């Protein structure tokens, strides 16, 4: 029996499985070979289908990738060969994250690509959940536990992506649907609600509270949008329209970086510092402010192009990284790379807004979840870029005719 492989679905699936996550049981050198092979295959796919990518979008992505590459190469002597290699590879991946997603969705449609993404990610999600329970729940923290695809943050962000894809695939409301509140219970919905409950419990069990916040944030917005819209239709539509504006999304990214400055300033107020110490709540807050105090000094030394992707410069002061998404991007790529990241965020959200549908809103909710989490974690990476690409392509899909979209 002949098995026909859809190259578009396969390209997205191998991108997810080999360029976004790593199986911890596989050795570093072996996985590196996998990554290089997949990068080359995806590059061939992109080159042969480059006509599907708008020129201005491609130029923006290449500019962002080059900012990472230049910073990495300039700092190669300080960072060493392995960090330099990682930075060069990430540069390559950035281009593929956007272009593979854009091409695949333009050729096969967002529903097919989302379904293919969901199916392949289940190959990682199921064993990850098994290893979470096998490891058990530590009394203090689960950050050092190693699961199927990494630590608790890797599993938590996978949960967020799975939730986003599930919401997208299960939002079948049409624009001319009645706005009355109808809740029909069937086996499919029971399965969906069960999945929601599982990922919420898993994040709580792992003590991945940032991931738990992201999931609850997305779920609340999705529930309000779908089931309560008939009561607050006008106000809610206005709110969604407001947060969907590309300028608002971009400003939100900037604001997520300002939290580092604000929190450090608040902790320097004697009364607040003494109160937090008296109730034993200085832990994570204090450790982050110790990092934030040194961020300005670190960035000022190389403000234009930064220290290169993967640089361990922050660890020389306090902590493994900047504990803030935008600050980490600025450390990696400087002002230039940060500006380009903001620019491509604006571009993708401007294109995505053209979809004007509740289905693609799942990607917008996820983007905001990553933005909010970036105030205390490093979330502006590959997953964030792919979500931007998916949301952007949904806007293009809505704009183009069916004949332009599908082969």
Question: Each PLM stretch: what is its role?
Answer:
Residues 1-10, 48-49, 177-183, 187, ...:
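A juxtamembrane structural motif centered on a specific transmembrane helix
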Residues 1-49, 63-78, 93, 127-135, ...:
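N-terminal signal-anchor transmembrane segment
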Residues 17, 164-168, 215, 219, ...:
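Transmembrane alpha-helices of multi-pass inner-membrane enzymes
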Residues 36, 57-72, 79-105, 116:
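Aromatic-anchored transmembrane helix interface
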Residues 49, 55, 115, 332-370, ...:
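Hydrophobic transmembrane alpha-helices and their immediate junctions
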Residues 111-138, 152-228:
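Alpha-helical transmembrane segments of multi-pass inner-membrane proteins
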Residues 234-245, 257-290, 314, 406:
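Flexible juxtamembrane loops connecting transmembrane helices in multi-pass membrane enzymes
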Residues 274-336:
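Long extracytoplasmic/lumenal interhelical loops at the membrane interface
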């Amino acid at each position: 029996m002949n098995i026909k492989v859809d190259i578009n679905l396969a390209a997205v699936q191998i991108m997810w499985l080999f360029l976004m996550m790593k199986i911890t049981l596989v050795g570093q050198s072996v996985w590196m070979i996998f990554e290089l092979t997949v990068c080359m295959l995806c590059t061939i796919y992109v080159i042969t289908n480059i006509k599907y990518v708008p020129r201005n979008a491609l130029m923006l992505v290449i500019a962002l990738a080059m900012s990472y590459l230049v910073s990495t190469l300039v700092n190669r002597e300080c960072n060493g060969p392995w960090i330099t290699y990682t930075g060069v590879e990430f540069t390559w991946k950035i281009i593929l994250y956007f272009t593979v997603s854009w091409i695949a969705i333009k050729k096969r449609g967002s529903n097919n690509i989302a379904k293919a993404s969901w199916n392949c990610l289940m190959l990682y999600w199921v064993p990850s959940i098994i290893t979470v329970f096998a490891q058990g729940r530590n009394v203090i923290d689960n950050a050092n536990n190693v699961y199927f695809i990494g630590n608790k943050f890797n599993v938590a962000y996978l949960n967020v992506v799975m939730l986003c894809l599930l919401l997208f695939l299960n939002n079948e409301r049409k624009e001319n649907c009645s706005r009355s509140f109808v809740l029909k219970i069937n086996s499919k919905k029971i399965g969906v609600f069960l999945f929601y409950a599982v990922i919420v419990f898993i994040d709580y069990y792992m003590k991945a509270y940032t991931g738990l916040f992201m999931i609850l944030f997305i779920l609340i917005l999705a529930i309000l949008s779908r089931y309560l819209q008939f009561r607050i239709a006008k106000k809610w539509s206005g709110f969604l329209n407001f947060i969907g504006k590309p300028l608002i999304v971009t400003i939100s990214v900037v604001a997520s970086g300002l939290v580092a400055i604000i929190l450090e300033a608040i902790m320097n107020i004697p009364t607040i510092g003494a109160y937090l110490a008296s109730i034993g709540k200085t832990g994570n807050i204090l450790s982050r402010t110790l990092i934030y105090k040194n961020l300005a000094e670190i960035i000022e030394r190389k403000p234009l192009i930064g220290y290169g992707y993967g640089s361990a410069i922050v660890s020389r002061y306090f902590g493994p990284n900047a504990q803030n998404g935008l600050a980490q991007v600025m450390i990696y790529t400087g002002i230039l790379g940060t500006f380009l990241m903001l620019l491509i965020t604006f571009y993708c959200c401007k294109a995505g807004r053209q979809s004007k549908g509740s289905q693609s809103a799942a990607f917008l909710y996820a983007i905001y979840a990553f933005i909010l989490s970036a105030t205390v974690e490093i979330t502006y990476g590959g997953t964030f870029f792919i979500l931007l690409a998916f949301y952007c392509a949904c806007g293009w899909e809505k704009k183009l005719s069916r004949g332009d979209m599908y082969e």
